[in-house]
Amino acid sequence: MGPITFQASRSVLAIVVLLPLVIVRRRARTKRIKANDRNVQTYSFRTTVKGGLLCGLMLCSASILQQIGITGTDVGKSGFITAMYIVLVPVLSFFISRKASVRVWVSVAIAVTGLYFLCVSGGSLAGITKYDLMLVACAFLFSLQIILIDCFAKKVDGVELSLGQFITTTVISVILMFV
């Protein structure tokens, strides 16, 4: 099974698990609305679809790059590079007017230094492979996905957003399987 087929299979499984949960939650929300429960939060279908598409595109792209990237580099290196999304989130958030503490910036510097020592051998950039670059792109896209989720989480139902992400991921992955 190739990386894209694996991604498609994983996404289909997520849909199978999430779809019944979304149906049950929607029915419960509808009953509460009909009972005039003022504490029921309603969500825009359009915003949910938009969030599912954008977050799903990031999730699919990042996951496929990760699946391909891990085939060409060692486990420790791939794990460290992929986990760089943890420090990339505050860096990218900075560009949308979210401030990070000094501790975060020190952590970013340490992580980037670690990335340098893992990927660069003998002071030459020749040690960086295309698989390493795929994993860096993967970390960047996972960071964008997290930032997008943060933006949409306040506006939509989280379970429905997850379902939308996996539907998007499945559609893209299935198309790519046959390309």
What are these regions (language model features)?
Residues 9, 54, 81-84, 103-106, ...:
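Hydrophobic core positions of alpha-helical segments in small-molecule transporters
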Residues 6, 10, 69, 74, ...:
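Hydrophobic/aromatic residues within transmembrane alpha-helices
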Residues 18, 100-121, 138-142, 172-173:
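Hydrophobic transmembrane alpha-helices of multi-pass small-molecule transport proteins
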Residues 50, 79-82, 97-117, 128-132:
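Loop-to-transmembrane alpha-helix entry segments
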Residues 3-4, 14-18, 89-90, 125-179:
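Transmembrane alpha-helical segments that form core, pore/gating elements
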Residues 25-82, 117:
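Specific transmembrane alpha-helical segments of multi-pass solute transporters/efflux pumps
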Residues 17, 21-22, 85-106:
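C-terminal transmembrane-helix exit sites in multi-pass transporters
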Residues 21, 50-72, 92, 116-117, ...:
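Hydrophobic alpha-helical transmembrane segments of multi-pass membrane transport proteins
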